[in-house]
Amino acid sequence: MAHPHLLAERISRLSSSLEKGLYERSHAIRLCLLAALSGESVFLLGPPGIAKSLIARRLKFAFQNARAFEYLMTRFSTPEEVFGPLSIQALKDEGRYERLTSGYLPEAEIVFLDEIWKAGPAILNTLLTAINERQFRNGAHVEKIPMRLLVAASNELPEADSSLEALYDRMLIRLWLDKVQDKANFRSMLTSQQDENDNPVPDALQVTDEEYERWQKEIGEITLPDHVFELIFMLRQQLDKLPDAPYVSDRRWKKAIRLLQASAFFSGRSAVAPVDLILLKDCLWYDAQSLNLIQQQIDVLMTGHAWQQQGMLTRLGAIVQRHLQLQQQQSDKTALTLIRLGGIFSRRQQYQLPVNVTASTLTLLLQKPLKLHDMEVVHISFERSALEQWLSKGGEIRGKLNGIGFAQKLNLEVDSTQHLVVRDVSLQGSTLALPGSSAEGLPGEIKQQLEELESDWRKQHALFSEQQKCLFIPGDWLGRIEDSLQDVGAQIRQAQQC
């Protein structure tokens, strides 16, 4: 076997060659190439004239001496037009029912069937056997067929509860294509003089028969780690709970796992990684509604769980809560003591903040938690200007409970010791205190926990950086995952600075 990284580089160069002259079709080419290299089937959905047939023709050039067969289905298509005509001579001389398959689907490595849903039952039944078993019954004999890639296309989806669903379920990869959108790409497409039938792939990059057969065995040796399986099972469980989720058969899940193994193999890895699971967005949908739903669920999986983002945020929340508890234990030492002002001519006693309190936003800790506005509150954030005005003139005072949401109206007073006290609806009070002095730094317990959490974050980010070199995953998905990890890292660093 070639060095894994050399193989990944070769497949990347092969894909680049196949993509030449095709605009906004890189993802489709790459997934069709992955399907061809792993012996799977692809369904292309989209309007006429958007290069669906050209994509299939291009894939022929990925292999040395590959034969291609393409056919436009109609309601009047016959098995003879797809699988070959009957041999009149064999029927006449020997009474054998045998087809002449040369130049037809049974002898092609790359097959493209357009308007697939117009095929009749006779064609569909034979096609199912060809896809499932890679076999073709020719008269009394069962012959192996060399098909590596079947690309089926249509501008519509099969009708629900029809005889076509069995065939549709065999189309592992499903891609929804549209017209060229970008202005520059549209211009380049209009002015391109490239002959669509030219072979754009150098001989050295083409896959030999021996390589293809060897790779099929090696793909099966790619491992599925426990943590990746847990992510897959989490996705499956979540889909089962959603009323509008598409039905995904066990067969489709199993075939999808082999596709993930192929993605890892041709990316130079020995095991499936979380990043490979993004491919499931092109395997599990059924129609337009389920396409959006599947993408949303996989996005949640990738940005929330695949690299432990949500788990790290939960740990961070617990550390921050513990830090606040430790600060509350010290609140008597740091209770906010106001300065009483002379009020000779004022009916209301006036106060001001201590001179060492200068922040524009003040976070004050409750000596004991209270339930305010149906929320368990441990600290309140005040705008300094609003608090100063209340201390001077009285009236209404508002603050953000636990520092989140909108500022809420509070029952606040100054007690006889010149401390601020907040009261709940039952008039239970809690003295407000300043957080511990920054000079004291973080408690050792909190500092250690944050350092351990940051170390785990660095490990997860390093794993993602290693795994994201995957030809078959769109860059925008990788960008969202990077953003989610950076957000977690930023929150950890912010907590370390408190």
UniProtKB/Swiss-Prot annotation:
The keyword Nucleotidyltransferase does not apply. Keywords: ATP-binding, Chaperone, Cytoplasm, Hydrolase, Nucleotide-binding. InterPro entries: AAA+_ATPase (IPR003593), ATPase_RavA (IPR023671), ATPase_RavA_C (IPR022547), MoxR (IPR045427), P-loop_NTPase (IPR027417), RavA-like_AAA_lid (IPR041538), RavA_ATPases (IPR050513), RavA_LARA_dom (IPR046898). One of its GO terms (cellular component) is cytoplasm. Its EC number is 3.6.1.-. It catalyses: ATP + H2O = ADP + phosphate + H(+). Homohexamer. Interacts with ViaA. NCBIfam families: PRK13531.1. This is Regulatory ATPase RavA. It comes from Shigella flexneri serotype 5b (strain 8401). The gene is ravA.
